[in-house]
């Protein structure tokens, strides 16, 4: 299992991951078709100060990151209207834009009032408009909100740009001195804040479905234990402290149960805890390593990684235990399952053959076909946006652990800005509004 024993130290010591992936014989990577051109014109600002954030740039980046839209570069814009009445549609037809957005920002009573409108260039008809207000510090929030509204109006898919991201950084100062930091940021890596620091590893952070709590593995006191923490207050409590492995926490869709991996009875297996009663049920049993649980949407099914067949593959089973059904058959390594919002696509770490080249891939669960989404070779820990349009994953670039974003259609692939040190273990929040 990409050496499942590395996996176990990545289940014990990296319990977010027995994961990583490679190419495949279907090798479909990025960009076989074009994203829709859209122009997000710089918003007009009727104020004296310089704003700390460029709302139009943030909105354009959001729409680009989805893989659905390709923003027109600012330097290609023939005109820059800020009001609908100022739009000259032939200018936007000339640069190939199919949609265009204008907006204005007006100071009002110590706050900023933002008006925006989105147009179909070909028909010259308004598609959507709205207003939002907030403080200067909330400019990014307002921009992500406008992105969400616009994306849903254009595609019928709820926008996921106002969501958050968890990840872990590791800064090594000397052989025996490493600082691990659990961070929360905007989905695009901006505005990172520290939730926890430790001299021991922090692994597998996961948002609860309410977005207010997280679970993670901490190696405080030199052994893995699972903790639950309130994001706002910082208050936390220990959930497991069994002998051996305690790792890979995964919240049920209703937030009332937590699946995780324990080795207290021998082999690493998946268990489920009722968080109300703290009663634990064993879900898997038998030979091999069973790890990386991930819940189906209805809370009755758990997907997981197992080497019971000799090499790591993805299986599914009832959350109450019982027989398991194999899900993946393409490639000699498939691990770390995540589902798209509609549960039609399985995102995973995939390897076709050999011992290297671990890539993020997406399997169509109806057809069984697998599409490679990345071109790197040491990918791990994929996490999927709540609307299923984007994947963030950890990989290595120039000898450093970094986070990357790829659209599920493969059109966009880009690095996320993060802090210094090794960055790993990303986890996407649910919708927060």
UniProtKB/Swiss-Prot annotation:
It is found in: Periplasm. One of its GO terms (cellular component) is periplasmic space. One of its GO terms (biological process) is protein import. InterPro entries: 6-blade_b-propeller_TolB-like, PD40, Tol-Pal_TolB, TolB_N. The keyword Heme does not apply. Residues 1-21 form the signal peptide. Pfam families: PD40 (PF07676), TolB_N (PF04052). Keywords: Cell cycle, Cell division, Periplasm, Signal. Belongs to the TolB family. The Tol-Pal system is composed of five core proteins: the inner membrane proteins TolA, TolQ and TolR, the periplasmic protein TolB and the outer membrane protein Pal. They form a network linking the inner and outer membranes and the peptidoglycan layer. Part of the Tol-Pal system, which plays a role in outer membrane invagination during cell division and is important for maintaining outer membrane integrity. This is Tol-Pal system protein TolB.
